[in-house]
Amino acid sequence: MIRITDKSLCCGCTACMNACPAQCIVMRRDREGFDYPVANPDLCRNCGKCTEICPMPDIKAHVHEESLSQEQSMKVIEEGGVIYAPSMNPDMTVGYAEVSDASEQAGLNDDMCVQSDLYATFEDVKYYLEDGRKVVFKGVPCYIAGLKAYLGGEQEGLTLIECGCHGVASPGL
């Protein structure tokens, strides 16, 4: 069962929450505004999937910045694919938007590097990939590492775009 005793060892990527077959992990916001996983011991099966999938030991401290051009985005969408990128929610929190129509791209925030509400995004990405659709996922390196861990590595049809990051700001700011 996952227990966060040192917050510097958790990036809040939600991979553990998404991997848990018992669905006993929820993300809770701390006083500083960061989300961390908390497991319900009454529901936990002690299968270890949450700790196995954690990408933190593999995250390298580097900045690798790419951009997805409008033309590339349009091509993915025209081919029936979807794009996931940070987007401002109406309640002024940052979540992930799923875009499958060219007219929806305007709401994406390509340069937003704050801790975002990912919640079911990893499950949705997996569903679309299993359905044979192309998926573009843009995010900070730890979210990309978490998604790759959740999916079991690189996947055909998945394009990952990292935004530069030197540590995300709290969404509570």
Predicted regions and their residues:
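Iron-sulfur cluster-binding cysteine motifs and their immediate structural context
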Residues: 2-4, 15-33, 49-67
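PAS-associated C-terminal
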Residues: 4-5, 39
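Short, surface-exposed ligand-recognition loops at beta-strand->loop->(often short) alpha-helix junctions
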Residues: 6-11
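Short, conserved beta-strand segments within well-ordered enzyme catalytic domains
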Residues: 26, 38, 53, 84-86, ...
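Short linker/helix segments within small regulatory modules
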Residues: 31-44
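Electropositive phosphate-/nucleotide-binding environments in soluble metabolic enzymes
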Residues: 41, 48, 115, 119
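Iron-sulfur-associated redox domains of electron-transfer enzymes in respiratory
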Residues: 61-173
